[in-house]
Amino acid sequence: MRYHLLGWLVLCIGCSSAPIGNTGIQTNTYDSSVYVWQKIMDSAQWKKNYNFQLFSIRDTIWTFHPDGNWYSADDGQHWVKSLLPNSIHNLAFLDYIVFKDAVYGLGYFEGNIETHLFKPHIYRTRDMQSWEVLTEQSNLPKRFFYHPFVFKDKLWIIGGEDERQQFADVWNSDDGIHWVKQLDQLPFGKRSGSVVVQLKHKLYLLNNDVWSSADGVNWVKETDAIVPGEQIFGYAALVYDEKIWLLGCNRNGQFSSQVLVSSDGKKWEGMDAPWSPRGGIAATVHRNKIFMTGGKYGGTPDHTEFMYSNDLWVLSKKNK
């Protein structure tokens, strides 16, 4: 494992109100918000890939990767491959989630959109060494391309799709096994790939637009577009320093390294980052820092081949 520590790269969200590039995003000054990115390593132990996950659990950071799972107890400086295997199989279609001090695997997916095998298995690990199959016959909705989230001590699912259609419903569960549909025909319509985060006491559903909710069922639109005039997708979303952060955005079909930040889901500022443009990254908040790795770049007329990443970066708030 190679370690490459850059000097501190100080990145402020704005010192002026000038637009960044041609994005329509304005930079504004946060009174006490000065952030720094630090590269921990050029190449982590896991293979270069995208659409996998990072977790923070019990003061340890975990990488859940298609080829296995790794953990670090020293802020990403050293990693150990775990005996814990990949249970849900295709991480591009389904997610793991931390719930009640354990990691849950919701379903099993093998194949692609057109031809696949889906099983409503529910997996759980508490010791981070082996999986317990809670059931092979849950009523987990048969779908993919959704991102489960935790709210009010329950697991939640919004939207997603199967091989025929997208959905506009919301489900929740106390245990991951028994799922109850709370509402259909949500006001934002059928969609998949939305990310839901909790900022303070409200949920924010993020796609190209932004909706908020205090109860997970009733939703209010905050903005029609995160970046007016652009289509934004493929990002990782998380909450850090009482703000929503979007990392690894695809903007109008072009991958970007600019991070988008908002304190209310309505107004968004851009912050340039030193890592290469990419989408499909893995990110988490751990010990009051943002950790990110993975992702892919390419698929455009001027860069037809995809390039994948496994470098590891950390963002923290600079002490004054």
Question: Language-model features: where?
Answer:
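Kelch-like beta-propeller repeat domains
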Residues: 19-320
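Sec-dependent signal peptide recognition
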Residues: 2-8
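C-terminal motif of bacterial Sec signal peptides marking the signal peptidase cleavage site
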Residues: 13-14
